[in-house]
Amino acid sequence: MKITPKIGIDKLIFGMLQKDVEALYGKPSKSFKDEDENTIYQYNALKLRLTFYKDESFKLGYIVGSSPELLLLDKKVIGRPVSEVQKELTSKDFAKWEKEEFDTLENYFNEENWMILQTEFDDVTKVEVGAIINAKDEFEWKFKK
């Protein structure tokens, strides 16, 4: 499954509605509302969690993935040392990373591409990607019907 920064993962494109996602992947393994009333879809087989934002007419705005099949720049990400992944990304508009620590986990956030590499024991365990917010403070939806 290819990660395309600013656009989505695999066939998932930011701005899709729930029905668009279900047409591609079927019903989710689990569906629930978060504390902000956003709809969350969880696809266990794909190891993906999708967030549809309530305030944006339930458009797909955020994806969390932990599948070992996730590819970024045609290379696997999950299970690899974060320093190795970051080194490969530095020349591809991923120069600046902010590090945040939570007990045994670290998050490395790249704002320009709205991506988080979550690590434990220095290896990437999850990748989070979100729709880009432009200078007008509006989402840049990539999905066009």
Predicted regions mapped to residue ranges:
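Short helix/turn-capping signatures at newly exposed starts of structured segments
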Residues: 1-145
